[in-house]
Amino acid sequence: MSESGEAGGEEPLTPEEPLTPQQARVTAEESSVLMAELPDGGEEPQLPASPAGRGVARNTAIFSILTGVSRIVGLLREIVAASFFGTRGPASAFTLAFQVPNLFANLFANAALSAAFVPVFTELLQKGRKKEAFRLASTLFWIMLIALGAITAFFILAAGVIMPLFIGDTFKGELTSLLVGLSQILFPVVLILGLTGILVAVLQSYDHFTIPAISPAVWNVVILVLLVILRPHYPGGYEDGNQLHAYAIAVLVATFVQLLLAIVALGRIDFRLQLHVDWHDPRIKQVFTLMLPVTIGLGIVNLDQLINSVFGTLVSDEAPRAIDNAFRVYMLPQGLFSVAVATVLFPTLSRMAANRDAGSMRRAVGNGMRQINLLLIPAAAFMVVLPNPIVRLLF
């Protein structure tokens, strides 16, 4: 969870605002999970020209457009938040309060869970075992509810002990209390994102990308609206950070709205959660085994971001927020282009893996990487040449 809801992204506590760092690594990690299931050798068959090829292209175009809208709205949210709260100590407290639960969300839910769940779920669908696939999804849903619910409850109770471990000497007194209070409001996002991630993965397995693509935009809009409505009810300003409680509540509510959107969308594929938990299902173990390498990869990226903020507190109470703003600017092209291609392509790759179609899969991965590089390299060059004007324009 960057501050983005992205359950997808992403954005994120990232409720998955799609600017989150885990999305920057999803393509490579997901590909490694799938390639591990394929045998080597054999003649490479041609990629289907249609309708599958056209379907992927169409879904990619739709997802890219909706993701672009989401990024624009997310950028607007960041600009509004910067104008309201600046980069002073209280804003940095919010950044840290967001990053810690976001790290947990990306380790145990969100992209890691989806990357492991989609191949297993898709393989069952490809074999015509729809009931087993739905039972697997239901079992994982309840397991995540129990496990993440317990982690969330523990963190809320122990936040006063845990959060001070992430701050330096520049955070004192009221800033520490603010950090603890904000983290207690935000940590339930971990549970909500975990549940949303499973439901969104089911939708993506059926090539339903509209709701997953539009959810981050809805997440950002809900935050903006609630921030404008709730902020006047919290007296204070830059110095005491009291109004940041309105921001935290807005993030929590917006993340829950993402879960509701996924639940509504599942009605289109006639998916119903079952009160069923099969602890002995071997596919549960398979999903968690596949999660391990993805979790390690995403954990390194998210831990790196948190470490940057922690070291920032040793320099200044403004440093964590400034570092976070810089991170979001340089991750913007990644969120616009890479996430769209990877998200749409992954279910197709899962079906190819289930059919042991190694040749088509290699070609699809190659095409996807070429598309991403074609867009990212010019964007990176543009940001290297014009960093100061870009930052001044946005903040």
Located regions from the model:
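Membrane-embedded alpha-helical bundles of multi-pass transporters/translocases
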Residues: S2-F395
